[in-house]
Amino acid sequence: MERRLTAILAADVVGYSRLMGANESGTVTALETLRSDFINPKIGEHQGRIVKLTGDGMLVEFPSVVNAVACAAEVQRGVRDRNKGVPPDRRIEFRIGVNVGDVIVQGGDILGDGVTWPRAWKALPRLVA
């Protein structure tokens, strides 16, 4: 069983169910565009690896916590800037948690407490980057 210490970023969309209920195809298209045009390149710039995607979220592994936090801050600032002029009820906003922890590697996936913590931290109040 392979173990390693890694920095983990977990993110999900605030109000995803509401956004999907209001405009399913528009939300999916907007989120896919945001990921491909902005978020995925930011992850790459910070040497991140997308471990898994969910409908409204992602789990990303980084070689250092500095990279993970820098990526999170840049994503939050960029998303905020991209939301200017978008009606509040149609904005795509993210909750992001970052942790450093020991993980178990299974294929391309990572498991363990190191992965669980950032998901719990996303529930805390958002900080403005």
Regions found by a protein language model. Name each.
Residues 1-78:
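Catalytic NTP-binding/metal-coordinating core of nucleotidyl cyclase/transferase enzymes
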Residues 40, 59-129:
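Catalytic beta-strand-to-alpha-helix segment of the class III nucleotidyl cyclase homology domain
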